């Protein structure tokens, strides 16, 4: 059985990147929540 995590920089950026977050209303809510909490990095 293969491992489930097959890293890809492109896929990571496209699904979890800053622009992906900004593209949807809920994504912007995520960023706002992370700013409110005082996260050092908004995008992991």
From Swiss-Prot:
Example GO molecular function term?
structural constituent of ribosome
Q: Which family does it belong to?
A: Belongs to the bacterial ribosomal protein bL34 family.
Species in which this protein is naturally found: Magnetococcus marinus (strain ATCC BAA-1437 / JCM 17883 / MC-1)
Single GO cellular component annotation? ribonucleoprotein complex
GO BP field: translation
User: What keyword terms does UniProt attach to this protein?
Assistant: Ribonucleoprotein, Ribosomal protein
Pfam families reported in the protein's UniProt record: Ribosomal_L34
Instruction: Indicate what this protein is called per its UniProt record.
Output: Large ribosomal subunit protein bL34
The domain of life is Bacteria
């Amino acid at each position: 059985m293969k491992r489930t995590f097959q890293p890809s920089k492109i896929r990571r950026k496209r699904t979890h990147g800053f622009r992906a977050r900004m593209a949807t209303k809920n994504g912007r809510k995520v960023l706002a929540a992370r700013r409110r909490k005082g996260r050092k990095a908004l995008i992991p």
